[in-house]
Amino acid sequence: MATTHDKITLQLPAKPEYVSLGRLSLSGIASRAGFSYEAIEDLKIAVSEAITNSVKHAFKGEEDGEIIVEYLIYEDKLEVRVSDNGTSFDLESRKQEIGPYEVDEDAEMMRIGGLGLFLIETLMDDVKLYYDEGVSVVMTKYINEKQVEENAKSIST
């Protein structure tokens, strides 16, 4: 059985001044979908980080780029896909360069860079990366935590 959803697409120039448009549109969409204030704040941070990563890393200021933000609104979740057609990267190599984060590490002493994906993975219920023509980050947030628990049970059994 196919799952139905509404889809909203936002096409942004890959420039820092447009990151806020992705965040603002997400806020309205998530509110309409029924997310709590706290969940909306988490979503806004994660999507801002994903768009900022595309602006900073995919195009590196050398070329005019474009970022596509797609919001897929389901009955029980919101899926956000941030895609660019810029330079791709190897996540595992990047993790090796950055190294692991220690729980007791002072935030002021953490290395600059590399926190974007860490934040996204922490704030969202599911995150997937795709490397086609550029990079796509697909982030999923369930509308209620009960759904997260149900999914966790089905995965572990």
UniProtKB/Swiss-Prot annotation:
Segments crossing the lipid bilayer: none
One family name in Pfam for this protein: HATPase_c_2
Highest taxon, organism lineage: Bacteria
Catalysed reaction equations from the record: L-seryl-[protein] + ATP = O-phospho-L-seryl-[protein] + ADP + H(+); L-threonyl-[protein] + ATP = O-phospho-L-threonyl-[protein] + ADP + H(+)
EC number: 2.7.11.1
Keywords on record: ATP-binding, Kinase, Nucleotide-binding, Serine/threonine-protein kinase, Transferase
Gene3D superfamilies xref list: Histidine kinase-like ATPase, C-terminal domain
GO molecular function terms noted in the UniProt entry: ATP binding; protein serine kinase activity; protein serine/threonine kinase activity; sigma factor antagonist activity
Enzymatic class: transferase
Family membership: Belongs to the anti-sigma-factor family.
Function: Negative regulator of sigma-B activity. Phosphorylates and inactivates its specific antagonist protein, RsbV. Upon phosphorylation of RsbV, RsbW is released and binds to sigma-B, thereby blocking its ability to form an RNA polymerase holoenzyme (E-sigma-B).
Protein name: Serine-protein kinase RsbW
Organism of provenance: Listeria welshimeri serovar 6b (strain ATCC 35897 / DSM 20650 / CCUG 15529 / CIP 8149 / NCTC 11857 / SLCC 5334 / V8)
